Design a protein with these regions (language model features):
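Long beta-strand-rich cores associated with HINT superfamily self-processing modules
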Residues: 523-551
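Gly/Pro-rich hinge or "lid" segments in bacterial periplasmic/extracellular proteins
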Residues: 63, 175-244, 248, 258
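Extracytoplasmic/peripheral linker and loop segments enriched in polar/acidic and small residues
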Residues: 365-366, 422-433, 459-527, 551
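Surface-exposed binding/hinge segments that line
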Residues: 123, 138-198
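Extracellular/periplasmic solute-recognition and catalytic clefts
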Residues: 223-233, 250-305, 324, 328-329
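Alpha-helical secondary-structure segments
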Residues: 118-125, 168-174, 218-219, 246-248, ...
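Structural transition elements
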Residues: 336-380, 401-405
Length: 551
């Protein structure tokens, strides 16, 4: 059986469906007892990028959770190969001013226990999302709903949210402002999934903690969740079950990437991400797929370290960095050196964002600029009353993964050599960095990244909106805030895009963060598996409509 190598490369910014293609040397054993050949059942098995701590769509914030949730919940709409298709809602009407959406639910939409899916299930879920008592890490995604942000901030009662179940099959949604990507957003973000109030209240804080403490409305149901293996089986009550080819999918979390690759070679996985150390062995044989994840360093401008609150020092960090050399040293040139915030493959002005706007004309040079770095450093030291650069120490926090350590060690070397400052490294677990360190602002500089939740630059730019719950940098710029607010109400799509681009320019001019790279993520896929979709927004991978060819 041949292996198929798939790469998510920056150059392609579109949704692509995988089909059988080029192979790589060697063969992959097949040891699955319940494969389609032996049992008549169609099954795929693959690894997750990180642990799957919860299937509560409003208390999760990782791609792994989103990938699992979109398969187990029926959304109002569904993103299928880049197109918005009806799901639990069979149709919808949009008011002339773009503020009111009326969704008409299917009468045959059911939960896995046979109960009907109702408009009230969506109303309850969305109110739970923005309710401060829920403390959802993704509550901000409901800002587009009427009064959503005010409710999140405790300024209004949750009953004032712009969502109303008119009757069992009619849901009326009122937006805070026209949102061109709204149908895409609710079709790819698990936070907008329906929830059964009786089930949530029955299990309380244990809701969705295990497979049996939930009911499911989507194409699959979770049947077990033990020992870092999550099993999903086809939902016979799903309204579109005849379009679902797989009988079962197993998601595995294996921390060691070498072990993941060994499992794939042994035939225990159908799909695996290629460890960075092995990418050079495969990348010339790769197919091209898009991935919208960009990596950067957050700078906590309000940390206890005063140098990071200084604009000139932040600019010195950015100009001192040779991103091309960094990419070669840290990533073996397997990623793409990047000097912006917004993924250039997003749609803008009838083309892509990268084509519409010349990033290099307003950002830092990819090769760095030592003279400018020195100029900004000297200005910062003068303003801060620091005599010697060697008296400056900054700390970079990252996860305990080997690849992350290699990345920050490369940054450490470049910054120390170019600026003469001292750079310390602190490593914590993945769970801690996103669960405590970043949200609690317990860091100075932090290596992280972001992938767009929807096909719009706003998804990246809102990270630097002063009142965003994901403003880990504690960055504040009234002009940026005003541009982002204005963009939400701007009916002229081209003018709106210009406002968003100006916000990106202002953020870069402030040195608010340190852009590093766009991820080129490589995957290997069994040739007998087809129909998996890759996206540069939100999920990255969608296996709902996957199929397995007969062996």
């Amino acid at each position: 059986m041949k292996k198929k190598l798939l790469a998510a490369l920056l150059a392609t910014a579109m949704t692509v469906t995988m089909f059988a293609g080029c192979g790589t040397p060697g063969s992959k054993d097949s040891k699955k007892d319940d494969s389609s050949a032996s049992s008549g059942k169609k099954r795929i098995t693959y690894t997750l990028r990180e642990d799957l701590p919860s299937m509560d769509p409003q208390n999760s914030n990782s791609i792994s959770c989103a990938t699992a949730e979109i398969c187990t919940y029926a959304m109002l709409t569904r993103n299928v190969e880049g197109e918005i298709k009806p799901d639990a809602a069979e149709s919808w009407d949009i008011s002339d001013d773009g503020l009111t959406y009326t969704f008409h639910l299917r009468k045959d939409a059911k939960w896995s226990d046979g109960e009907p899916i109702t408009a009230a299930d969506f109303e309850y879920s969305w109110k739970r999302l923005v309710n401060p008592e829920t403390a959802s890490p993704y509550a901000f995604i409901g800002d587009c709903l009427k009064n959503g942000q005010a409710i999140e901030q405790g300024k209004m009662d949750v009953e004032e949210l712009g969502v109303k179940a008119v009757d069992d099959t009619t849901l009326e949604v009122t937006l805070e402002h026209p949102t061109s990507y709204f149908l895409s957003l609710i079709g790819s973000s698990g936070q907008f999934a329906p929830l059964r109030q009786d089930i949530v209240e029955k299990y309380g804080t244990d809701f969705a903690a295990t497979s049996e403490k939930n009911v499911y409305s989507g194409p699959f149901v979770m049947t077990s969740s033990e020992d870092n293996v999550w099993t999903f089986e086809k939902n016979d009550n799903y309204w579109d079950k005849d379009s679902i080819n797989l009988d079962k999918c197993e998601l595995n979390y294996v921390e060691n990437t070498d072990t993941q690759l060994s499992m794939y070679e042994a035939g225990d996985l159908d799909y695996v991400q290629v460890p960075t150390a092995y990418v050079s062995d495969y990348k010339d044989k790769a197919d091209v797929f898009a991935n919208g994840n960009v990596d950067f360093c957050y700078i906590n401008s309000k940390s206890d370290n005063p140098v990071l609150g200084n604009k000139n020092f932040r600019l010195a960090l950015n100009y001192a960095l040779n991103r091309n050399d960094y990419n070669k040293l840290a990533n073996a040139d397997t990623f793409t050196a990047f000097n912006g915030l917004v993924f250039p493959g997003l749609q803008a002005k009838g083309t892509t964002y990268g084509e519409a706007y010349d990033l290099n004309s307003y950002s830092y040079p990819l090769d760095g600029d030592q003279d400018k770095a020195t100029e900004y450093l000297n200005a910062a030291m003068k303003e801060l009353g620091i005599a010697n650069a060697s008296d400056i120490t900054v700390e970079v926090v990252t996860t305990d993964a080997d690849s992350s350590k290699r990345i920050v060690e490369t940054l450490q070397e470049q910054w120390q050599n170019a600026l003469g400052i001292k750079v310390k490294i602190r490593q914590v677990t993945y769970a801690d960095i996103y669960g405590k360190v970043f949200p609690e602002h317990d860091y100075e500089i932090g290596y992280g990244g972001w992938g767009s939740d929807y096909d719009d630059p706003y998804s990246y730019l809102e990270l630097f909106k002063s009142d965003s719950s994901y403003n880990y940098s504690q960055y504040e710029n009234p002009e940026v805030d005003q541009l982002l607010i204005a963009s939400q109400d701007e009916p002229d799509t081209d003018k709106r895009m210009d406002e968003l681009n100006q916000a990106e320019q202002d953020i870069l001019a402030d040195g608010a963060f340190v852009p590093l790279q766009a991820r080129n993520i490589y995957y290997m896929l069994d040739d007998d598996t087809t129909g998996i979709n890759f996206y540069y927004c939100s999920l990255n991978i969608d296996w709902v409509y996957a199929d397995v060819n007969a062996k």
